Structures are given as C-alpha cells and as structure tokens.
C-alpha cells in the first residue's frame, strides 16, 4: 500500500486521477534544517527526509487497518523551481511574485522534483517498519513561459495562486495558460513524475 508523505493537493489529485490506491499522511519534517545549496540535490534530500521522517515515526501514528500489516511504500516528494541558477520556492508575498513573473516572462526555467520511495513491511503488533529498499531520483522538466504584459501578471498574482506554488505558478491551475510548453515529464511540473512512480512502484 502506498503512503503519500505530503499534504500536497496536486500530488493527491495526480494519484487519484490515475486510480492509484494510496493514503495521504503529511510529513512533519522541518525543511529549514537542510542546508544543501545545489538545487538538484536539495530537492532530492528534502524528498528523502520527508519520507524518512514518516517511516521513523510510523509506529506512533493511528493508521487505517489496511496499513497495519504487510508491505508499505512511503513516497516523499519535493519540488523546487530553478530560474537562471536561483532557487524559486513559494513567493512570500504578491510583490515578490510579480517581480519573479516579470523576470520569467518569455524565458524558461527548470522544475526539479525530488522523489524518494521507501519500501518495507510494517507490523503493528511489534511496531516495527522494516525497510527493504530505498529508491531516489530527481526528475527535471524545462518550463517555457509566455511573453506577458504587466496587467496579465498582476491579474494572475491577484488570484493568490502563485503564493502557494513552488516557482510561483501552477500548471494545473490558472497559471497553466501562461506556460508556452514543457520539455520533459509533464506531471513532474505538478509535483510528481507519474512515469517514475509507475516504473518503481510496479517493478
């Protein structure tokens, strides 16, 4: 049974749309404790720590009956947008979101999503989660943005959507109409590479 160690609604929807059975349990890992400067590696390390934090504390959680015995796969993900070598997380306010979009207009950047799948068996009686395998990879997609007028950027920023998304945009939301094209995995830009998950979940 798959556990999504994330509160992300985008990742949840991707799994639901593909009819992948899973439970969503948010990881309580403190992301500020990681100091990795390489953006590619940072996304991977954060994904691992999210999944690992849940695996280490799983015995303290009130799990559904289906998860109390047998094989478990814990999926941790983290997305970071890279623009000209700089990491763009969620904008802290509308002003920052507007400035970013001014820079990104007509340009391209990379959406890196770190993926970690911790595979093991959990026995609720002994409260032991025995890890058998850990699979990790960062998947990167190139995102091209349309040339936008200031009023278009302001209109988008005023929806508040950019404030809740890595990089300040949501491909599956209002921001999708401002994205010219994607090179690489499409679903990766929404926070989870479904081809990567299929390959490693159903081996």
Swiss-Prot record:
One of its GO terms (molecular function) is nucleoside triphosphate diphosphatase activity. One of its GO terms (cellular component) is cytoplasm. It holds the Pfam family Maf. Its main location: cytoplasm. The keyword Manganese does not apply. It is an enzyme of class 3 (hydrolase). The active site is at 78 (proton acceptor). It is found in: Cytoplasm. InterPro entries: ITPase-like_fam, Maf-like. Its cofactor is a divalent metal cation. Belongs to the Maf family. Nucleoside triphosphate pyrophosphatase. May have a dual role in cell division arrest and in preventing the incorporation of modified nucleotides into cellular nucleic acids. This is Nucleoside triphosphate pyrophosphatase. It comes from Prochlorococcus marinus (strain MIT 9301).
């Amino acid at each position: 049974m798959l556990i999504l160690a994330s509160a992300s609604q985008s990742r949840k929807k991707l799994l639901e749309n593909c009819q992948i059975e899973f439970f969503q349990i948010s990881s309580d890992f403190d992301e500020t404790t990681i100091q990795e400067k390489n953006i590619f590696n940072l996304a991977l390390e954060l994904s691992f720590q999210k999944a690992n934090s849940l695996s280490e504390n799983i015995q303290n959680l009130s799990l559904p009956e289906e998860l109390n015995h047998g094989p478990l796969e814990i999926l941790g993900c983290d997305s970071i947008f890279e623009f000209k070598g700089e990491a763009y997380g969620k904008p802290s306010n509308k002003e920052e979101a507007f400035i970013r979009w001014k820079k990104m207009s007509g340009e391209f950047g990379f959406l890196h999503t770190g993926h970690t799948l911790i595979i093991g068996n959990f026995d609720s009686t002994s409260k032991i989660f025995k890890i058998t395998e850990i699979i990790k990879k960062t998947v990167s997609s190139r995102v091209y943005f349309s040339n936008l007028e200031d009023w278009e950027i302001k209109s988008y920023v005023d929806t508040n959507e950019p404030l809740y998304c890595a990089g300040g945009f949501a491909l599956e939301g209002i921001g999708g109409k401002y994205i010219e094209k994607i090179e690489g995995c499409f679903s990766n830009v929404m926070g989870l590479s479904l081809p990567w998950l299929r390959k490693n979940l159903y081996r």
